[in-house]
């Protein structure tokens, strides 16, 4: 329940999108995609299928077997459970939200929220591969496959900015020790 999650210092936000409750945490790749469906000549269902196919192709690129189940258009499944959630919203033909791909999150927390609360299994690319998956490799592959699926074969991927610097300071990690927060 939302009250139980908040007691564990997990913020709960209600959103206007389809799909299940999703825990956002380190190790998860979130792709918030904004496109005009009329310009892409796509329906909402076609768009969702494009997102699913892009995730499946990304999984294949990192040697993870993934599949789509027609009965559940809001997920991509690995052999051991859901590896990606799809949650979208469309307003005046423009999409928001998108894909939430579990690369290397803590699965114990993920299994207690959303699908986990419904008894469904949750997995990650690392768990499916049984060895580390590099986030930059997954990010590049996902962007490439999204662009291909959405009809944008030409794209440029920039992963840095001269004024942005990565820091190593840990401000707050509620997953490391929930009692100390």
Which sequence ranges carry the predicted segments?
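Short, conserved beta-strand/beta-arch hydrophobic-aromatic motifs that form part
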Residues: 1-6, 10-11, 83-107
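N-terminal lobe of the biotin/lipoate ligase/transferase fold
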Residues: 1-78, 82-83, 133, 163-181
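Structural signal for conserved beta-strand scaffold positions within catalytic alpha/beta enzyme cores
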Residues: 14, 85, 124-127
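Solvent-exposed alpha-helices and their adjacent loops that cap or buttress functional pockets
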Residues: 22-23, 92-94, 117
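A structural signal for short, well-ordered beta-strand segments
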Residues: 31-33, 74, 86-88, 99-103, ...
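Generic detector of bulky aromatic hydrophobic side chains
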Residues: 37-38, 54, 58, 94-96, ...
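A short secondary-structure junction signal
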Residues: 42-45, 87-88, 110-113
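C-terminal accessory segment of soluble enzyme catalytic cores
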Residues: 96, 107-181
């Amino acid at each position: 329940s939302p009250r139980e999650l908040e007691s564990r210092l997990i913020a709960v936000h209600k959103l206007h999108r389809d799909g299940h409750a999703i825990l956002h945490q380190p190790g998860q790749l979130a792709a918030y995609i904004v496109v005009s469906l009329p310009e892409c000549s796509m329906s909402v269902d076609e768009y969702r299928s494009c997102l699913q196919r892009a995730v499946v192709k990304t999984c294949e690129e990192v040697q993870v077997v993934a599949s789509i189940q027609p009965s559940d258009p809001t997920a991509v499944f690995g052999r051991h459970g859901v590896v990606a959630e799809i949650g979208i919203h469309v307003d005046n033909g423009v999409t928001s939200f998108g894909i939430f791909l579990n690369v290397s999150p803590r699965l114990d927390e993920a299994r207690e929220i959303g699908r986990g609360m419904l008894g469904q299994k949750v997995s990650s690319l690392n768990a499916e591969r049984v060895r580390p998956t590099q986030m930059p490799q997954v990010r590049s592959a996902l962007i490439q496959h999204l662009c291909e699926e959405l009809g944008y074969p030409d794209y440029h991927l920039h992963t840095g900015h001269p004024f942005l610097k990565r820091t190593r300071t840990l401000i707050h990690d509620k997953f490391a020790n929930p009692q100390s927060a």
